[in-house]
Amino acid sequence: MNAAVLIDPARLTDASTRVQREPFPFVIATGQLPADARAALREDFPRYSGAGFFPYAAEDCGPSVNRLVEELTARPFADALGEQLGIPGLSAYPTLVTICRSLNKRHGTIHTDSKSKVATALVYLNESWPDTSDGCFRFLNRIDDIDDLAAPEIKPLYGAIAAFKRADNSFHGHLPYEGERRVIQVAWLTSEEEKARKTQRGKLSRLFKKLFGGIDRKLGAGRDRNAAHRD
């Protein structure tokens, strides 16, 4: 892999990107990562012992993933995304990066995200995906129906991005899925205090999952497809 830019804001704003304002502002884009970066990003992706999202730490990742995180949190990408979402100066907000390598069936219940988030971007890095809707990201019209889609579902394939402006009706989620599902999540937050609080909570969650991951997996195994929580 050469030193070329991994995430080019110009690609995000080309004609193939889907931008929607209703029922809330969101963006769907594919092909956002270069093909020649696949191998490095695969090798450099963090290896977590538990399932779910964990706070980004540079020491967990190899150089290409660290570079990608740096570019995703830099002003050019943030402001290009903010323009698409109707959020001027998105880069002015503090960022929180979390990374997921695998899920259990508890994850993906319908929710809006908390009010401490201004916007969220999910960048997928899976080189293939089964012929199933399980684990495919969905923007939704309502909180109680995973099948009431606001746009076509998004397979979490390499280079796909799903991003949205947080709102009281920014419902999203996916059908239960267990297994590897690589994704980097960038959240722009309302304050540094919220970033510190969420980071600390994420570290505690990582410890809990390391100690009690088997229980977490069993509790989520039978979750309802329309399971939801507000944030």
Task: Place the predicted regions along the sequence by residue.
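Conserved short histidine dyad/triad with adjacent acidic residue
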Residues: I99-D113
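A short coil-to-beta-strand element that immediately follows conserved catalytic motifs
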Residues: P88-T98, S133
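Acidic, metal-ligating active-site segments
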Residues: A119-E127
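Active-site rim elements
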Residues: S64-E70, H107-G108, L149-A151, F171-H172
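Non-heme Fe(II)/2-oxoglutarate
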Residues: A3-I87
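Short helix-loop capping/hinge motifs at secondary-structure junctions, enriched
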Residues: A35, P130-D131
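Short, conserved, surface-exposed binding loops centered on an aromatic residue
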Residues: S91, I110-S114, W129
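Catalytic core of Fe(II)/2-oxoglutarate
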Residues: K115, S133-D231
